[in-house]
Curated annotation (Swiss-Prot):
Family matches, as NCBIfam families: PRK04940.1 (NF003431)
Protein name: UPF0227 protein Swoo_1808
Family assignment from sequence similarity: Belongs to the UPF0227 family.
Gene3D superfamilies: alpha/beta hydrolase
Domain of life, source organism: Bacteria
Length: 179
């Protein structure tokens, strides 16, 4: 089972296309939708949804995949549920770069302060990070510098921020899921 978390643009038709692409790895891909506007509510909602989905699968190695803001949640929700995660162009600092886009961006700081301290050290090796060199939204070198001590970093030379075509990364994601 693959749990897929969309980015900030929840209604993008690209989400459906990514789900179709991920079905080449696992036929059971489930979209977990969330508001993107209310971080504390989103966190509780996602924790409940993941817990529910885990009870409904017999997959011994489910993973959670998120793009952009979904990558922020995939890392945290994956850690809290003991799941491997794939972070595609993750938004590491929504409290800084979501100002004016969501109602309460400061809630992200509050979530970070309440999270398990040093969770990345405890989650080391359990996330795969895929970064676009052509990301038009984030400076992914900064993301790489932040995460490379904990997770494998894979660079993509072609895709933009929303990563519409996963094809070149599917074998890597599949190996990570099974490994």
């Amino acid at each position: 089972m693959i749990l897929y978390l969309h980015g900030f643009d929840a209604t993008s038709p690209g989400n459906h296309e990514k789900i179709r692409q991920l079905q080449f790895i696992d036929k059971d891909v489930r979209l977990l939708s969330y508001s993107t506007l209310h971080p504390k509510h989103d966190m509780q909602h996602l924790l409940n949804e993941v817990s529910k989905q885990l009870k409904l699968t017999d997959d011994s190695e489910p993973i959670i995949i998120g793009v952009g803001l979904g990558g922020y949640w995939a890392e945290r929700i994956g850690y809290l549920n003991g799941l491997k995660s794939v972070l595609i162009n993750p938004n590491l600092t929504p409290q800084d770069n979501m100002l004016g886009k969501i109602d309460r961006p400061e809630e992200y700081s509050d979530i970070a302060n309440k999270c398990v301290s040093e969770f990345r050290e405890k989650n080391s090796g359990k996330s795969l990070v895929i970064l676009s060199r052509n990301d038009d939204t984030f400076d992914n070198q900064v993301v790489s510098d932040e995460l490379s001590r904990f997770y494998e970093i894979c660079w993509d030379e072609e895709q933009p921020h929303k990563f519409p075509v996963l094809a070149s990364q599917l074998p890597r994601i599949q190996a990570f899921k099974k490994g």
